[in-house]
């Protein structure tokens, strides 16, 4: 990454595209403080006040869900809600959250190790919904999901985009075009928006492919 200077607006889903090794996950890890940046800072405007992004601002959903498999779904949600009790805004009951994610009653008291990939992904998404982060990072979150669960997740993300910045990293261009409001390329370590003005969907897709191909040839 180099000379990253970019402004994301709340209320939009940004599709982050780039070739393999372009630095998409590195950018997320820097935002999430998992990697230390060599220079510069990330800022967020809240209520007209500019400040540095903190860990509490970030929600991070990985392509491979990480959940404590020795807990049941209900125990996991209760644990998360208990440790974040003071910061939760208008919390619902555990079963209301399960209903929201279409997790069936018979699955709620199963161990997480017995959950399918899609259900683990739903649980990972659910704790981010409960936390209500200002910035939601999604690193290939729909990978390996079946068609029904993937469509449910897309509808969920559209409903959640208000009042937060959502950045969706994917290598599937059609998914990005279907879900995202803006397409951003990570090109030679620099972020740049792909302008869609006056282009139909085919022309827009061709423009993205040309930009990615140019990156690979340089």
Regions found by a protein language model. Give the residues of each.
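The feature captures the beta-strand-to-loop junction immediately N-terminal to the Walker
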Residues: 17-19
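Helix-to-loop junction immediately C-terminal to a conserved catalytic motif
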Residues: 32
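Conserved ABC transporter NBD signature motif
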Residues: 40-54
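Q-loop/switch helix immediately C-terminal to the Walker
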Residues: 64, 70-84
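Catalytic Walker B motif of ABC-type/P-loop ATPase nucleotide-binding domains
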Residues: 136-140
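Helix N-cap at the start of a conserved alpha-helix in ABC-type nucleotide-binding domains
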Residues: 147-149
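Conserved ABC ATPase "signature" C-loop
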Residues: 188-189
